[in-house]
Amino acid sequence: MQQFLTLGALWTLFNVATTISLPKYSSSQTYFAQSDPNIPVSQVDDTNNFGLKSQYSWDDVVSNLASNEKLFFLQRHGQGWHNVAPSNFSRVDWNCYWAEQSGRDGVVWEDAELTPKGVQQIQNLHQRIKDTPDFPQPEKFFVSPLRRTLQTWNITWNGLPHKTPLIKEFAREIYGIDSESKRHNKTFIHNYVPSFEFESGFTEQDENWSPDKSESDQHCDYRAAVLLQDIFNDSPDEKVISVVLHSGIIYCLLDVVGHRYFPMATGGAIPVVIAIENYNTDYPLNDAWDTFKDWCPNPPASISGTATSTATGSA
């Protein structure tokens, strides 16, 4: 059962606990160049067979999975409007004001959709999957509830063998403060992707996002561990899993499974063999949230492009 907690419930929990015990995870370093610490990241060619080493086939990977292992295909959404918007502002203006707004001049980055470039990136990925000999077709599909990931799933998998994806709350991006991490309500999402399914307990309103606090890397790691536990529990017999999500939560997933850092461009994907161990470990939660002051430690006297004065508090 998913340990699915709203922001309010999480706050209550953190007042009485600084750690949560969840399964320990590990990842294989055998099959993929991205996973091999002996291969410098700069020398990894993940455009060739998604990084699968030449001495192995996809069948080698899947047929040799242990009973507690699965092959995860972790996919980052294509470029969204929130990825390009910050280039129009100074870093301090973006962090202290514009990131919290819904958009500007007709460009919406709140729960951002894909840019034309982002659509093309995912069309290219779709073709790469289609052209990859013996590509292991996922047996279960999971996706973040944000619009850019829902679009990405549709463009990637429509026209390829697939099953109905399950929308997972904890597959979302690091959330809080900035508007790009705030999801639409459940009714909107259903109308946006009517054929998708929601996990049990998915709330109508976004009860996790807050305008005042953002989850820390520590909390993101905890959430990644919960997400993996859910997927392993929901997929006892499936060996190949697809998850469409975001760079922040992907990095947390890699951290939790002991995988080295690997940069993920928009529209990218990384295959990872992940094992769930038969024992638990403690995930610390003593520093679970960042505040607006962490985002904007030195507010400017004014924000470019607005009449806003942070000195007077007007907005």
Curated annotation (Swiss-Prot):
One of its GO terms (cellular component) is side of membrane. Its main location: membrane. Keywords: Cell membrane, Glycoprotein, GPI-anchor, Isomerase, Lipoprotein, Membrane, Signal. SUPFAM superfamilies: Phosphoglycerate mutase-like. The active site is at residues 77, 173. Residues 287-315 form a propeptide. Glycans are attached at residues 88, 154, 185. Residues 1-19 form the signal peptide. The lineage of its organism: Eukaryota, Fungi, Dikarya, Ascomycota, Saccharomycotina. It comes from Candida albicans (strain SC5314 / ATCC MYA-2876) (Yeast). This is Phosphomutase-like protein 3. It is found in: Cell membrane. One of its GO terms (molecular function) is isomerase activity. It comes from the Eukaryota.
